[in-house]
Design a protein with these regions (language model features):
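ABC ATP-binding cassette signature C-motif
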Residues: 1-174
Length: 174
């Protein structure tokens, strides 16, 4: 069963066509990696798959009740917040009843232990790990990850690779 279908997609920015008649189907439990040179529409395809952008033509549909979590290439945060204030905002948006325990566990696993630290003080790798914690602590059917290992050290990239191999949901990543 297709969880996600992108059919005959066209997407252009000003006069530059990035996707022209592209089709993509993702089934339950399928893991797909997208490769290509810079500027060829990989990130655009992920944003379309995550429902963050609309195609110029074609259709993007997901199966009923499918939840998609998206990790952008460069996550954005409110730099005036502490790590924990940011996580609390995400917890308050969730319907899960025990998100606080799950969040603290995921943050520890990813090496984020100074919860009172301002986000503005985090390194690029710490920011990426915070963004990963944010999406991995919430249940979903499909993970859409745009260059999830950039800014991560070797050990954390290896941990993420192992986590994604064991993860039972569907995955699209660049």
């Amino acid at each position: 069963m297709n969880l996600l279908s992108l059919e005959n997609i066209t997407k252009a920015y000003t006069e530059r066509v990035l996707l022209d008649g592209a089709s993509f189907f993702l089934q339950e439990g399928e893991k797909v990696g997208i490769i290509g040179i810079n500027g060829t529409g990989k990130s655009t395809l992920l944003k379309l798959a995550a429902g963050l952008e609309e195609p110029d033509t074609g259709s993007c549909t997901k199966a009923n009740h499918v939840v998609i979590r998206y990790l952008p290439q460069t996550p954005e945060f409110d730099d005036s917040c502490t790590v924990w204030e940011h996580v609390e905002k995400k917890i308050s948006e969730s319907t899960q009843w025990d998100m606080e325990g799950e969040a603290k566990s995921m943050l520890r696993t990813l090496g984020i232990v100074r919860l009172e630290q301002k986000i503005s003080e985090l390194s690029g790798g710490q920011r990426k790990r915070l963004a990963l914690a944010e999406i991995l602590m919430q249940p979903c059917d499909i993970l859409v990850l745009d260059e999830p290992t950039n800014h991560l050290d070797h050990a954390m990239a290896a941990w993420l690779e192992d986590y994604l191999k064991r993860w039972r949901g569907s995955l699209i990543m660049v």
